[in-house]
Structure formats: C-alpha cells, structure tokens
Amino acid sequence: PGGLPWLSEADRRLQVQSDLPWWLVCRGAIHKFRCVPHLTGRRFEHGVTDCYTLFRDAYHLAGIEMPDFTREDDWWRHGQNLYLDNLEATGLYQVPLSAAQPGDVLLCCFGSSVPNHAAIYCGDGELLHHIPEQLSKRERY
C-alpha cells in the first residue's frame, strides 16, 4: 500500500488462507513475507507459538526480521537470559519505559530474575502479548 514494503490487509487475509509465503516487489526490491497466522487468538505452545514468536511475527509483518532461536521451556530457571543475550545482536536497545513508543517490545520478569516474557506496546496503555495457557491477545495493562 502506498509504495511501502508490506502486505495490505487484503493481502494478509488471502495469505493466511493460502498458508504460503508471499513475495512483494516494491520500488525495485523483492520482499518475502513468510506466512504469519493472525496475531491474536493463537494457542500457546512454548517455542512454537509463544510470546517471542508473537513479537517476531509482528515485527516480520512490519518488515523487520528477528532471528528464531531454540528455547527450552523454563530456560530462565536454568541460568539462561535468552532475551537479553539474543536481542542485542539484532540491533534492539533499551529505552526507559516513559519513552516507549507503539511497536516497542517490553520485556517482563514473571517469577524470574531475568526477562522471560515479551509484549509489544500498542500505545494508549495496551499490549499485544501471549501468556502461557491463554490465547494471544491485545489488552490494557
């Protein structure tokens, strides 16, 4: 839309139905969009459809590629710090919460001394996130 390198809403609906990657040519460049299911209403499966997958998929739809990395359940209880260890290599950097912009990733510590949950700040006090044993959703915090 408007010469920008991302799929339109109609393209996304058709892509989800087809369950295939789509290619888009924009301003002479070719962009590949892997098939990403709807961001809300996903069932939670650690390492497959979890909070990291949700934010990775949301960023992909915005044209930003984040690496996938193997993660075992409860990695934060076994001395790993996967978010901080892996995200710095992608070019992300820490900002104060007061400076958060829509689209920024918020890292949270749930019963852990290291960040073990990621959420996307949507603006106006809303987050997009995926908690174990719940469907992914957008909600006020």
Residue ranges of model-derived segments:
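Short HxH-centered metal-ligating active-site micro-motif
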Residues: 1-10
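Divalent-metal-activated hydrolytic enzyme cores
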Residues: 13-37
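Short helix-to-loop capping/linker segments positioned immediately adjacent to catalytic or ligand/cofactor-binding
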Residues: 39-47, 94
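Active-site nucleophilic cysteine motif
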Residues: 44-62
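Surface-exposed patches in mature extracellular/periplasmic domains of secreted proteins
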Residues: 66-71
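Short, Lys/Arg-rich amphipathic alpha-helical interaction segments
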Residues: 138-141
